Amino acid sequence: MHALQKPHFLNLLFQRIIALLEIGLVCTICKLFEAADGTIAAILLLFLHRRTALIQMLKSLILWQSRFRVVVLFTGVIWILILLLPQLLSFAGLSRPDDSSFADQIQGDLAALVSILLKVWTTVAFGEEMLGRVFLIDRFEAVFKGIPGATALSVILASILFGLAHAYQGPSGVILAGTIGIILSVLYLQQKRSIWTNVVVHGMVDTVAMLLLFFGVKFL
């Protein structure tokens, strides 16, 4: 019995080590590039070679158009969170997330607004969802394979990393982004791991934010 279990244990251990190495490699590449282009390059190298993942992505691209109400609902929920959570965190003594870098870039500057929105819809939304949901959840599930609650634990850890990626906004920005990461992870799982619904929601949230900053509306 023990002889049969040993190869299984070693195989599981090997899978976990490989998953951790992939997570570390992707995070390192993203840090080096400091841009969504690096995120996409890393994810495509380490994830899209899997035939089943590519097929699932193509199927979900075809089907996402029927999910308009879901997009509206989750975009609304995230914006309610954006408006309320910083206020609650301020009561706990945390400063509000710092969005001054974006505000200074695009307020009243139509060319800058268009440039940022093009990035949002071509690389940022797709790249962050590929990393924050598709890749990290998949790899953490490989790390915790066979452990009860593996998916929930994977969502939490992936969302923590997603929050830390927004550390430039300060502690409250990390908490806000991490909480949004959990909501987007719930959407990803609820949509049977469709990335495209997430991409549209992510893009809509960022688009509204950029438009508000362009018109000088302070929302954080």
Task: Give the role of each language-model region.
Residues 30-32, 42-46, 106-108, 173, ...:
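Short secondary-structure boundary micro-motifs
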Residues 5-13, 60-72, 106-110, 114, ...:
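Hydrophobic, aromatic-rich alpha-helical transmembrane segments
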Residues 48-51, 99-108, 164-168, 193:
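Short, exposed beta-strand "edge-strand" segments with a Pro/Gly-rich flavor and a Y/T-containing core
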Residues 12, 16-24, 38-39, 71-83, ...:
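Alpha-helical transmembrane spans of integral membrane proteins, capturing the lipid-embedded, hydrophobic core
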Residues 1-70, 80, 211-220:
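N-terminal, membrane-interfacial amphipathic/helix-forming hydrophobic leader that caps
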Residues 56-124, 142-143, 147, 219-220:
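Juxtamembrane helix-loop-helix connectors linking adjacent transmembrane helices
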Residues 112-220:
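Transmembrane helix-loop-helix hairpins at the membrane interface
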Residues 6-11, 24, 86-89, 97-102, ...:
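Generic detector of short, locally flexible boundary/turn motifs and exposed helical patches
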